Design a protein with these regions (language model features):
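Peripheral, non-transmembrane regulatory/ligand-interaction domains of membrane transport proteins
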Residues: 1-125, 131-143, 172-175
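A conserved cytosolic signaling coiled-coil/coupling helix that links sensory/transmembrane modules
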Residues: 96, 100, 155-159, 163
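Generic hydrophobic alpha-helical scaffold/packing signal
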Residues: 134, 155-158, 167-170
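Two-component histidine phosphotransfer core
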Residues: 145-153
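Bilayer-spanning, highly hydrophobic alpha-helical transmembrane segments
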Residues: 165-177
Length: 177
C-alpha cells in the first residue's frame, strides 16, 4: 500500500506530514544510528529519505517482474481455463495499479529533488546526491515502461485465450444444434 507524505523544510528543520510510520523512516533512523555523520542537517535527512524511497521503488519493481514471470508462464504455458484466465487478469490488474503508483511516486520524487537543486538549497555534496537520485529515477522509468508493455501484452494474450475458449464452446453448440 502507498501513503502520501508531505515535507516542510523550515529554519533548518524538516517536518513530515503522514498518517502512519513508514519503513523508509525506520531505515533512515537505523542507518543514522549506525553511521555517525550519515546525515548532518535537515536537507541531508530529506535527500536520504528520497533516496531510500527510490530504493524501495526499485525493490517493488523487481517484485512485479517476478510476478509477471509467473503470469507469463501461466498465459504462455499449456491451455488455460477461463477460471485461470480470470485469476491471471485480476493479478495483472493489481500489478498494473502498483506499477502506476510507483511511476507516480518516482515522478513526485523527481520533482522534489529537481526543485531543491533548482532553487539552490543544496550544497555541492547534496547536489551530487540529488543528481544520483535523478539518475536512479531515470533508470527506473525505463523499467516501469517495460512493465506496462509486458502487462498489456499479457492482458491481450489472456483475453485472446478467453476468446478462443469461447469460440470452442460456440462451435460445440453449433455442431450440437
Amino acid at each position: 500500500d502507498t501513503m502520501r507524505v508531505a515535507f516542510i523544510l523550515k529554519s533548518g528543520m524538516l517536518f513530515s506530514i503522514r498518517r502512519d510510520e513508514l519503513a523508509q523512516f525506520r531505515l533512515l533512523r537505523l542507518r543514522a544510528r549506525r553511521q555517525p555523520y550519515y546525515v548532518r542537517d535537515a536537507k541531508d535527512v530529506l535527500l536520504q529519505l528520497l533516496d531510500i524511497d527510490v530504493e524501495y521503488s526499485a525493490d517493488i519493481i523487481e517484485g512485479i517482474y517476478d510476478r509477471l514471470d509467473t503470469f507469463s508462464k501461466q498465459v504462455l504455458g499449456s491451455e488455460m481455463s477461463d477460471d485461470t484466465a480470470g485469476i491471471v487478469l485480476s493479478g495483472i490488474a493489481v500489478e498494473e495499479d502498483l506499477n502506476g503508483r510507483i511511476r507516480r511516486n518516482l515522478m513526485d520524487t523527481r520533482r522534489a529533488v529537481s526543485f531543491l537543486m533548482r532553487v539552490k538549497l543544496l550544497n555541492e555534496q547534496q547536489n551530487d546526491e540529488g543528481r544520483q537520485i535523478l539518475r536512479d529515477i531515470d533508470s527506473l522509468d525505463g523499467h516501469t515502461g517495460f512493465v506496462f508493455d509486458k502487462l498489456n501484452f499479457l492482458m491481450d494474450a489472456t483475453v485472446g485465450f478467453i476468446n478462443i475458449n469461447q469460440n470452442r464452446i460456440i462451435k460445440i453448440f453449433s455442431v450440437a444444434s
